[in-house]
Amino acid sequence: MSFFLGLDTSNYTTSAAVYDASNNTVLQNKKLLPVKPGEKGLRQSDAVFQHTVQLPQILSQLPISDISGIGVSVKPRNSEGSYMPCFLCGEGTAGMLGHAMQVPVWKTSHQVGHILAALYSAEKLSWIREPFLAFHVSGGTTDCVLCEPDEALLLRITPVSCSLDLKAGQLVDRVGLMLGLEFPCGIELEKLAMQSTRTFRYKPTMKELDCCLSGLENQCQSAINNGEPPCDVAKRCLCAISDVLLEMTKRASAQIGDLPIVYAGGVMADLLIQEKLQNVKKSAFAKPAFSCDNAVGTAIYASLCNAGN
C-alpha cells in the first residue's frame, strides 16, 4: 500500500489529505472554522470544539481504509515550548486511527507541513535533500527559516528572521476588518486590491534581518480615515507586505548564502504578493490550494518518513 493520511487542525482550518506515493497524487478535504461576523478569530476552546465537530465529517469524505501510515501536525513549530491546544484534535485522532488500523503515526509541526505542501505544489520536493530557505507567512508567523536534511526530523528548522510584532496574516485580517470584510479576509482583500490602478512602494522597517509590521496597520487606518478608496487601501496593504518580504529575502540571502527559497503559508496564496517576488532567483511558490492551511504536507511527511524507515 502507498496511501498516507495527513491531518492538520490549525486555528483556521480543519484539514485532511490522502497522498498516493505510487503516482505522486493527492486528494485533500478541508473546511474553515466558522467565525462570527465581525470577530477576529477563534478562542482556542472554540477552535477545539469546532475541530471535534468537523474532523469526522472531513475524514468521512476521504478514502482512508487502505492507508500505510499517518502524518499529523502536533504543534505550530519544531521548537521548544511551541504549543497550541487546537493541534491536540488532530494528534488524538491520528493516535486513535493509527492504533485501530495498526499503522504508524509520524508527528511533525504545522510549519513543516506548510513547507512540504509548498514544495510538492511547486514540484520541488527534491529540495529536501540539500539546505534551502523557506518563508512561512501566515496569520501566526512571518518567518524565514533555514531548512536542512535531518535523519530524525526529516527537516531541521533553524530560525533566520521574523516579524518582531504583527504577523503578515494578522495585518491582512485587521485591514480587511477595517474595510468591512469577513474574517479571514485574505481572499476578499486580494479581490478588492485587484480593482486598484495605483502603484504603491513601501520602505520596510527592519531591525537587522527582522521586520516590523505594526506601522503598516496604522498607515492603512490613516488612509481609510483620509477617505482613500477601499481598493487602494487593500492594495497599499498587500504591496507593503510584498516589499517587506522582498527586503527580508535580500537580507537572509546575504547572511545565509545563495540558497533556493520556497514561499509557503496562507498569505503567499495572494497573487499580488507573489508577483513582486517572482524575480527572486531560485524561488518557488505554492498554488493557492497548497498555500492556505492544509494537510497535504503532513501526508507527504508520513510518506517520506516511511520511505526513510
Region spans (language model):
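Phosphate/pyrophosphate-binding loops at sites that engage ATP/ADP/AMP, CoA/4′-phosphopantetheine
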Residues: 56-69, 249-259
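A contiguous, well-structured pocket-lining segment that forms one wall/lid of small-molecule binding clefts
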Residues: 187-261, 267-284, 303-309
